[in-house]
Design a protein with these regions (language model features):
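Alpha-helical membrane segments of multi-pass proteins
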Residues: 1-346
């Protein structure tokens, strides 16, 4: 039984190993969350939605899977590709899930208690957040740092904590539980994620891909888990994971932000498809053919113009039809029986 996953010279075995520190950490996170949520609800301060609880539990499960046997043990001392998989899971899966599950009052109270409110205001600045994440990523994947930290349980624990902290900072401008820390512009959020996650990572991932020799002594000297898979091949696969592993989640987030932006700004209505319907004339006659056009009802069509049946109320200028009489003292126009000129139908 060990406290945390670390490099080992023992041959790899698929016999499960218990890492008590990992288990206690996950239990402590969940216990803290549910106790604080229960006390807040009992005191009437705020309630935690069921969806938020599910997100936190899912995030902790991903965190546990990335830290415990077998992935945690493989990443700590046997496979560079497993090490990189841990990094991706910490950065773009577990951490954002947990952040999305934290109620704003809970997170704000935690920062205030730890006296970190002012610090997080600075860390949430997009440029600062991007620098913190990318500097941490490059520093922890530098060969001397990786070999040093992975050699002991304490060092491996420190590396995992650094990844989680950097991931929290990365996501602050986009999904911070405290809304005042988020960026105000959806296009800004999309551009930030693209630049913060997709640019700097090219350098270390390219180094892993093009190197003809193993650059990590930890994984070069480790007993082979897959006998036909060399340390260089494992390292190259790690480079692929580092470059592309976060791409689906980051681009899915950008797409979600884009959809929300279009919905809230009205762009989806402006560029969306036109409503279709049948022309309804002032005399009540209905055209048999469906046509494309603006969604006007007979009660809302411009004076003397045909209307489209089945449209939404309020989409057009009010006319003075029998269904929408003129105000008192104003003469109501009679519907014209003359055919409409072509320019009035356009």
């Amino acid at each position: 039984m060990s406290w945390w996953c670390a490099a080992s010279t023992k041959p790899w075995t698929w016999a499960p190993t218990i890492y008590i520190g990992v288990w206690l950490t996950m239990v402590a996170i969940l216990a803290w969350y549910f106790v604080v949520a229960h006390r807040a609800a009992a005191a009437g301060r705020y309630t935690t939605a069921r969806r938020q609880k599910v997100l936190v539990v899912a995030g902790v499960l991903v965190l546990w899977a990335a830290s415990d046997w077998p992935l945690g043990a493989l990443g700590a001392g046997y496979l560079a590709s497993a090490h990189m998989t841990q990094f991706v899971l910490y950065s773009v899966v577990a951490t954002p899930l947990i952040m999305l599950g934290l109620p704003e009052p809970m997170f704000a109270a935690m920062l205030a208690k730890l006296r970190l409110t002012s610090v997080f205001r600075i860390l949430a600045l997009p440029l600062v957040a991007a620098l913190v994440f990318n500097i941490t990523m490059v520093a922890t994947h530098a060969p001397p740092t990786t070999d040093l930290l992975r050699s002991s349980q304490i060092g491996s624990f420190v590396m995992d904590i650094l990844w989680i902290v950097a991931a929290v900072v990365l996501w602050l401008p986009v999904i911070s539980p405290v809304r005042s820390l988020r960026m105000r512009s959806y296009p800004g959020m999309m551009g930030y994620l693209f630049l913060a996650v997709g640019i700097v990572v090219i350098v270390p991932s390219a180094a892993l891909l093009i190197s003809a020799e193993p650059i990590y002594r930890t994984y070069e000297l480790a007993p082979r888990v897959i006998t036909k898979w060399s340390a260089v091949e494992d390292q190259q696969f790690a480079g692929v994971i580092m470059k592309l592993g976060a791409t689906p989640i980051v681009w899915a987030t950008i797409l979600a932000l884009f959809i929300r932006w279009t919905n809230e700004s009205g762009l989806s209505n402006k560029f969306g498809p036109k409503y279709r319907g049948r022309l309804v004339h002032d005399d009540g006659s209905v055209e048999p053919e469906w046509v494309d056009g603006p969604s006007y009802t007979s009660a809302g069509a411009p004076l003397g113009e045909p209307a489209l049946s089945g449209a939404r109320p309020g989409d057009a200028r009010p006319d003075r039809s029998p269904l929408n009489p003129a105000p008192a003292g104003q003469q109501q126009s009679e519907p014209s029986s003359e055919p409409l000129p072509p320019e009035r139908l356009n």
